[in-house]
Amino acid sequence: MISSFRAQCAARVVREGGVIAYPTEAVWGLGCDPWNEDAVYRLLALKARPVEKGLIVVAAHIHQLDFLLEDLPDVWLERLAGTWPGPNTWLVPHQDRLPEWVTGVHDSVAVRVTDHPLVQELCYLTGPLISTSANPAGRPAARTRLRVEQYFHDELDGVLGGALGGRRNPSLIRDLVTGQVIRPA
């Protein structure tokens, strides 16, 4: 895959521990390296979001999540594969394979394989990313780059410009173990 210069620049910022904003399927997101504790805590502070709530991890391809999915039953893997890539976020048992600053106080972690081309490109360059809506707690999610800049001014390390994916609502969230819908689309 030949990556765009802007995606390469954003990926470098992420690899260096930065927090970026980027367009997702329905709203603008904030992202960083999930294994970089300082970056994740900075992102949480920008949003005024408690670490206990946990965060979503987004990937370009299901194989980027193999470290997390490798011991799951085949029926669960088939369920995931049948809904990805796409606007389906699943709560998956993390088995302590991700740090607590990503999972919060939960035994599962929210994961999604995106179908947004720019987010896929970014994840191919960086590996899985944190993906959370670009808004301070209690405010509506940003649907424009201007709103991102109004919310966060110069507190971000980068903004990857591009178009939203055209969906009206954030992704559906379901529990992989129970099948329960946690957040409707």
Curated annotation (Swiss-Prot):
- Name of this chain's protein: Threonylcarbamoyl-AMP synthase
EC category: transferase
Q: Which Pfam families match?
A: Sua5_yciO_yrdC
Location of the protein in the cell: Cytoplasm
Describe the function of this protein. Answer: Required for the formation of a threonylcarbamoyl group on adenosine at position 37 (t(6)A37) in tRNAs that read codons beginning with adenine. Catalyzes the conversion of L-threonine, HCO(3)(-)/CO(2) and ATP to give threonylcarbamoyl-AMP (TC-AMP) as the acyladenylate intermediate, with the release of diphosphate.
What domain of life is recorded for the organism? Answer: Bacteria
Q: Which HAMAP family match?
A: TsaC
GO cellular component assignments:
cytoplasm
Asked if the keyword Isomerase belongs to this entry, the reply reads no
Q: What is its EC number?
A: 2.7.7.87
What family is it from? Answer: Belongs to the SUA5 family. TsaC subfamily.
Extract one GO molecular function annotation from the record.
tRNA binding
The reaction(s) catalysed by this protein are: L-threonine + hydrogencarbonate + ATP = L-threonylcarbamoyladenylate + diphosphate + H2O
Q: Which UniProt keywords apply?
A: ATP-binding, Cytoplasm, Nucleotide-binding, Nucleotidyltransferase, Transferase, tRNA processing
Please give a single GO biological process term from the UniProt record.
tRNA threonylcarbamoyladenosine modification
Residue span, YrdC-like domain: 4-185
Q: From which source organism is this entry?
A: Pseudomonas paraeruginosa (strain DSM 24068 / PA7) (Pseudomonas aeruginosa (strain PA7))
